[in-house]
Regions:
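Patatin-like phospholipase
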Residues: 1-6, 14-144, 152-324
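Cationic-aromatic interfacial patches
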Residues: 10
Length: 324
């Protein structure tokens, strides 16, 4: 330990005594699993960790997928039966995945955080394409609102140049039309029905991965922020249906209906945390690339009161330099 920054103990199921010793002296346990096998806890795994529950040793599950796998699946089944602090998906023989695993295990992970910003969110696509072209890599992804939508492409490991094509095909030119076109003619809950947004998200995800994809099935660890109006606080979503969670994070109050989750109402995450750099830092990222789309400017209006609709409309017809 005096001569090296890190020591790795390689255990062998045929030597249970050594396994116990290795775990007892470890600062972190890394479980490596063949993702094509049963998710059930093996006998050696149960024996290995059962005697050290009170040590609270951080545990990482590394799931190895066959080369060429389009998307992980059924990750939730693995996570539900064992206590791990994080999981990492890698493809056999994939140099980029191995480099990502190395950064995560050595505490050098790079996080990408995409802020909300309405229509400005399309800017994220250009930025991610530029990062990809420049060879800039990242290991964790997090986003709010529009950043949650665009961040899902990065989390699914969609190539930078393909993101724009898939986004336009799903959210603008898709078979259901524009996501802002499903007006609610009786806007009791919201201006838009919200159905198109969900279908468009499902279409984008199915094109790049699989239908009904869980957030835990993303190649890169991913979180989105929603605003829980039932508990009056932000809510971090890392598990559950990816399309549903993305819509929950981007449902602007009054414009789209809330997402009902476990009996609670979730709206656009921008109400509580529009630029969740703090959550990315808590996730363990050593370096963070943050993209904030909203200008940090204070704007004051020299008006005695809010104008009426007619006054505001007339003001729009004035020359730009004379508008109030």
């Amino acid at each position: 330990e005096l001569a090296h920054d890190a020591l790795y103990f390689i255990t062998d199921p045929s030597e249970p005594a050594w396994c116990q010793t290795a775990v007892h002296h470890s600062d972190e346990v890394v479980l490596v699993a063949d993702a094509t096998t049963s998710p059930d806890v093996t006998e050696i795994e149960a024996k290995l960790l059962s005697g050290h529950r009170n040590l609270r040793v951080p545990t990482t599950l590394v799931m190895v997928h066959p080369a060429g796998t389009k998307s992980p699946s059924d990750t939730a089944a693995w996570l539900d039966v064992r206590h791990v602090n994080r999981h990492v998906h890698i493809r056999a023989g994939h140099a980029g995945d191995m480099a990502r695993l190395s950064r995560i295990l050595s505490g050098r992970a790079i996080g990408l955080v995409l802020a909300g910003g309405g229509a400005r969110g399309l800017t994220h696509l250009g930025i991610m394409a530029a990062l990809d072209e420049a060879g800039v890599v990242f290991d964790y992804v997090g986003g709010t609102s529009a950043g949650a939508i665009m961040g899902s492409f990065a989390a699914m490991d969609v190539a930078g140049d393909k993101m724009k094509v898939v986004s336009r095909d799903s959210f603008v030119d898709g078979p259901i039309g524009s996501i802002t076109g499903d007006y609610n003619w009786v806007p009791y809950l919201s201006l838009l029905k919200g159905g198109r947004a969900l279908k468009a998200s499902e279409r984008a995800i199915a094109t790049n991965a699989t239908s009904n994809m869980d957030m835990a099935d993303c190649w890169k660890n991913y979180f989105v922020i929603a605003s829980n109006f039932s508990t009056h606080q932000e809510q971090i979503l890392t598990r559950g249906d990816l399309a549903v969670n993305v819509v929950a994070s981007s449902s602007i109050p009054g414009v789209m209906p809330p997402t009902l989750m476990d009996g609670e109402l979730l709206f656009d995450g921008g109400s509580f945390n529009n630029f969740p750099v703090d959550r990315m830092r808590a996730m363990g990222a050593a370096k963070i690339i943050g993209v904030d789309l909203l200008p940090d400017l204070d704007r004051r209006y020299e008006l005695p009161k809010i104008p009426t609709s007619g006054q505001a409309l007339r003001d729009r017809f004035r020359p730009r330099g004379k508008r109030r």
